[in-house]
Amino acid sequence: MNTRPQFRPVLWILALALVLTACQTETAGDEEAAEADAPTETASVESETIAWDYTGETGPANWAELNETYEACAGSRQSPIDLVADDEAQDVNVEFDYTEAEGTLFDTGHGVQVNIEGGTLRIDGKAFALKQFHFHTPSEHTVDGTSYPAEVHLVHASDDGELAVLGIFYEEGEANDFLAPVWEDLESRATMAAADPLMMNAADMLPADRTTYTYPGSLTTPPCSEIVRWHVMQEPLTMSAEQMEALTAIYDDNNRPVQPLNDREIDRVTL
């Protein structure tokens, strides 16, 4: 699987608007409707909001039937997936150009998100601007069938409407210094709404090992648009038990089940 996946140019302005407005949202401003949450991964429609959830009649199994704008949720290039790549990691031209910027804690209605526009991810010379990062517990992607307690998605968008999402797993261990200031306002959804902006640099979130699984996929929340270049890092980071409990106390089980790989290939690359 050394052939890098080819991505079709996508100009889905609606999908991008939904993603950038809130990659997953039940109301204008809700988060996790997609991996393009810019400022979230949530889907938010100003004129009409279609409720979706992670369980019951509005859960993942029925997303594609809730509204015609969600039909892509039944597509053939959906995310998340189980990550399995046996080949040796290949080098790819990716540049991280993150800068210190103001991050704002945001309650999407489906998860914890931080809206931040602080830098650029360049893939083969193409620029993707950082828009936000948000959390799923437990992880959405799995590795050889194994899940992690949490996963963060850093959502980036290009000028032509394509998304690049960087996924990082978390396991329980030492306290995470980068997340500590953010977690001070995670006592409840009310404290999230009243939180003051924080200065942060997304570069401080990245693990030392830049080996990633990469594949073409979609937003993991409605509208599930298939416009995402996924890069999921192989090395997990840690959170303390207290940090993990604070996160899951507000939102837990906000993960879409893994989707069929179909005819896609998963590459393992070093960034």
Which role does the model predict for each range below?
Residues 4-7, 12, 23-271:
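Alpha-carbonic anhydrase
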